[in-house]
Amino acid sequence: MPLSNLKISFLEMSHFNKWSSSRLAQGLSASAGMALVLLALLALFFGLPVRAATQSNTILIVGDSLSAEYGLRRGTGWVPLLEKKLAAEKVPAKVVNASISGDTTSGGRSRIAALLKTHQPSVVVIELGGNDALRGLPLGMTEANLTAMTQAAKKAGAKVLLLGMMVPPNYGGAYGADFAGLFSKVAKAEKVALLPFFLAGVADVPDVAAQFQADRIHPNEKAQPKMLANVWPELKKLIQ
């Protein structure tokens, strides 16, 4: 075979290799795209939440003054202590504290959709309800709001931890039992994690005054590690 023909053959082979590689890459890309579409369709068909592949391990805390460092030095509340705990435990998680002093379950319910969309959390901690009781709001409203928030978080693909609260004895035994019970009722109905009493070891001890600020409503700096100690065992189960 003449040398000139060999050169042409090599050139033709080079063009063929480039063409076949390009077609193969296009085929693989199309296959990957079809696989993602199929997974999304299956998830929708079976009612499973579709979560972004880049979703980070984010813990969203939706609470009131108990989680917003009311009356405390910055960095001493239980939420900043949680961030330090995660770092010490080498847990790669980000904490977003969306707590607002004075907030009620109605306020939390009005904010939850935007918070879920913005932060795409893997875990949502709901610490609300105390201000509902202080304002004498209907228990049915509090329960409905907690249920709606829990369902929204679950629909977004997040795990949920409810932090239960109790009211002082002067509210009456029947009201106190019903109020404390609504947290477990919601948790059981929605199949989510529950911490029965967020302020255990803080508000139910003989020397209560030593654990609270002068207003006798908000835990002081000394109480914050105990509050974290209450939350951590339940939260740890959700982030492992």
Predicted features along the sequence, with ranges:
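Acidic/histidine-rich helix-loop elements
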Residues: 71, 96-105, 133-137, 216
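Intrinsic low-complexity/disordered segments
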Residues: 9-12, 20-23, 41, 48, ...
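Serine-esterase "nucleophile elbow" of acetyl-processing enzymes
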Residues: 51-101, 111-120
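Intrinsically disordered, low-complexity and often Lys/Arg-enriched segments
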Residues: 2-33
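Alpha-helical cap/lid subdomain in secreted, periplasmic
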Residues: 5-6, 12, 17, 81, ...
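Bacterial N-terminal signal peptides
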Residues: 31-47
